[in-house]
Regions:
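Extracytoplasmic
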Residues: 9-41, 232-237
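Helix-breaking motifs and short loop linkers at transmembrane-helix boundaries and internal kinks
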Residues: 73, 94-100, 111, 128, ...
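Conserved MFS/SLC helix-loop-helix module at the cytosolic interface between two early adjacent transmembrane helices
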Residues: 59-99
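Extracellular/periplasmic helix-loop-helix junction of adjacent transmembrane segments
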Residues: 32-59
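Helix-loop-helix hairpin linking two adjacent transmembrane segments in secondary transporters
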Residues: 100, 134-183
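Paired small-residue
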Residues: 84-91, 99-107, 310-315
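Cytoplasmic helix-loop-helix junction between adjacent transmembrane helices
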Residues: 104-144
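Juxtamembrane intracellular "pre-TM" segments in multi-pass secondary transporters
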Residues: 1-3, 188-218
Length: 402
């Protein structure tokens, strides 16, 4: 018989699993200056790779965790990922070179891919329809608060223990979540429902997936949207510190922006049925082209002081806010023609877009020169390309329907 905790405990457990990702990214941001000074003092921009290497590993892991959980069950994959995450965190705590730290962070990301995919599958195993949507809305409500808190938590830990202490916090966090999962939740995907992995079927599904123009274009749009986010996240701490001299208050500003940005998902839920997914994506990307273009122009012409910081703050909010009105919608568009292979499609689409987004974001972040200009230029270009792609998709769909 399945053992399922009560609703409040179930939601809290899932939220903690999801929060592993936000904690692993956002709590690291205050540590980047110390990591740069300790491990790469001659090229401090390379400390950004501590963020993007984790996301890259998570993207790769997303390819495998969904299918593996269908074959072996949800709990073994989640707990195996947690074991990898904890082991990698310990290695990271003892890393003496940036290269070893980046390798450990990549392995951390691989382990963290489990909560990203498998926790959602657990909800789907136990609930469906409106009840599933209700459970996930509560989970995401809790989850969206974590990016607001994580930098402050990270800053406190780093002040007390130094940057290596943050990895021991990751070990503790994941250990608590894993023990909670083991003790309180039974396997939700019983053996009789599992499917053996067949390479031939997998290849055929991939060929079908990437043979759909709407899927390929949607992945391109999503990758560029992710690139904007990853570029901002990997560079934002340096901009607060070096460009504006606000390193100490960074966690508070970042938390405030994250709280306001979370309302993007709420607004999307209210508007998407009336205005449509394609319109909202096009509108938000158009706004981002204008915002990034104005930011680029004003910083290039030497805007400084409080007005410059206020402009950056508004622009940062726009980059985070647009995620709530674009990513879910572009995912839904990509999934429209491949509902019969939804599980595989979700994993492959998410993984491909994440990995591509990281590969685009890394050079953008490494160009940081002490000002927001390189970041604004990169996001301006990414927004234009994403806007062109979604417009191409809309026109192609209109032509096919005619």
């Amino acid at each position: 018989m399945r053992s399922v905790p009560g609703r409040v405990e179930f939601i809290a457990l899932l939220a903690m699993l999801f929060a592993t990702i936000a904690f692993s990214i956002d709590a690291m941001l205050p540590a980047l200056p110390e990591i740069g000074a300790d491990l790469t003092p001659d090229a401090i921009n390379r400390a950004q790779l501590v963020v993007t290497s984790f996301v890259f590993g998570m993207g790769i892991g997303t390819f495998f965790t969904g299918p593996l959980s269908d074959v072996f069950g949800r709990k073994p994959v989640l707990l195996g990922g947690a074991a990898l995450y904890i082991t990698a965190s310990i290695f990271a705590a003892y890393a003496e070179t940036l290269e070893l730290l980046l390798a450990a962070r990549l392995l951390q990301g691989l382990g963290a891919a489990g909560p990203r995919v498998v926790a959602l599958a657990i909800v789907r195993d136990l609930h469906s329809g409106r009840e599933m949507a209700r459970i996930m809305s509560f989970v995401m409500m809790v989850f969206t608060l974590f990016p607001a808190l994580a930098p402050s938590i990270g800053a406190v830990i780093i002040d007390v223990t130094g940057w290596r202490g943050i990895f021991w916090a990751f070990v503790l966090f994941s250990s608590i979540a894993s023990i909670w999962l083991m003790v309180r939740l039974s396997e939700t995907h019983p053996r009789e429902n599992r499917r053996p992995f067949r390479l031939k079927t997998f290849r055929a599904a991939l060929a079908e997936l990437f043979g759909q123009r709407v899927v390929v274009i949607s992945i391109g749009v999503q990758a560029l949207i992710f690139a904007m986010l990853f570029s901002m996240i990997s560079t934002v701490q340096q901009i607060y510190d070096i460009s504006f001299g606000r390193a100490e208050s960074f966690p508070l500003w970042f938390g405030g922006v994250a709280i306001f940005a979370a309302s993007g998902s709420v607004l999307n839920a209210a508007l998407v049925m009336r205005l449509g997914m394609r319109f909202l994506i096009t509108a938000m990307l158009s706004v981002q082209v204008v915002m990034a273009g104005v930011t680029l122009a004003l910083f290039a012409f030497g805007l400084s002081g409080t007005p410059a910081f206020a402009l950056f703050l508004v622009w940062q909010l726009s980059v985070f806010f647009q995620m709530g009105l674009t990513v879910g919608n572009i995912n839904a568009i990509a999934m429209e023609p491949v509902g019969h292979i939804a599980g595989l499609a979700a994993s492959v689409i998410g993984a491909t877009a994440t990995v591509a987004g990281v590969l685009i974001a890394v050079p953008n972040g490494l160009m940081f020169d002490g000002t927001p200009v390189p970041l604004a230029a990169g996001i301006f270009i990414e927004a234009i390309l994403a806007l062109l792609l979604i417009r191409w998709l809309v026109r192609a769909e209109a032509a096919e329907a005619a």
